Design a protein with these regions (language model features):
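Short solvent-exposed loop/turn micro-motifs enriched in small/polar/acidic residues
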Residues: 22-24, 85
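Residue-level detector of intrinsically disordered, flexible termini
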Residues: 10-13, 29, 72, 86
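Zn2+-dependent cytidine deaminase-like catalytic core
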Residues: 40-127
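Short, basic/aromatic recognition patches
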Residues: 5-20
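Short, surface-exposed loop/turn motifs that are enriched in glycine and acidic residues
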Residues: 1, 20, 48-49
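Short beta-strand scaffold segments in enzyme catalytic cores
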Residues: 26-33
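Short, compositionally biased leader-like segments
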Residues: 1-9, 69, 106-108
Length: 129
């Protein structure tokens, strides 16, 4: 899939901008909105660890701040290809359970998941009705 290649490439570039002086765990993300626009993010750590933010949430918040609300896919690149944390999965779920999650490592291996496979019982806006 051409979009997957582009998303993984952009996520890898975003990873280079990560600020991870404490964990040394750099993460990059690229989020494809249904509008066709792509938003990138990197993790930003803070000496007060709880104030750090993940790459996936940076990408989502950038997109939302530009008016996006519907997303198709997100690519996440780490050294060893780990999936997004629970908080990031929940933030993505806020905007739809049909988002494809692509994880890749720095060697080029990748896996793709449906968001609902990663967060099968996510809390959604419908739970508030």
């Amino acid at each position: 899939m051409k979009d997957q290649d582009k998303l993984v490439s952009l996520a890898a570039e975003a990873r280079k901008k990560a600020h991870a002086p404490y964990s040394h765990f750099a993460v990059g993300a690229a989020l494809l909105a249904k509008s066709g626009r792509i938003y990138t993010g990197c993790n930003v750590e803070n000496a007060s660890y709880g104030l750090s933010i993940c790459a996936e949430r940076v990408a989502v918040f950038k997109a939302v701040s530009e008016g996006e609300r519907e997303f198709e896919a997100i690519a996440v690149v780490t050294e060893n290809g780990v999936t997004p944390c629970g908080a990031c999965r929940q933030v993505l779920m806020e905007f739809g359970d049909d988002i494809q999650v692509i994880v890749a490592d720095t060697a080029g291996h990748r896996r793709a998941f449906a968001l609902t496979d990663l967060l099968p019982e996510g809390f959604t806006p419908e739970h508030l009705l």
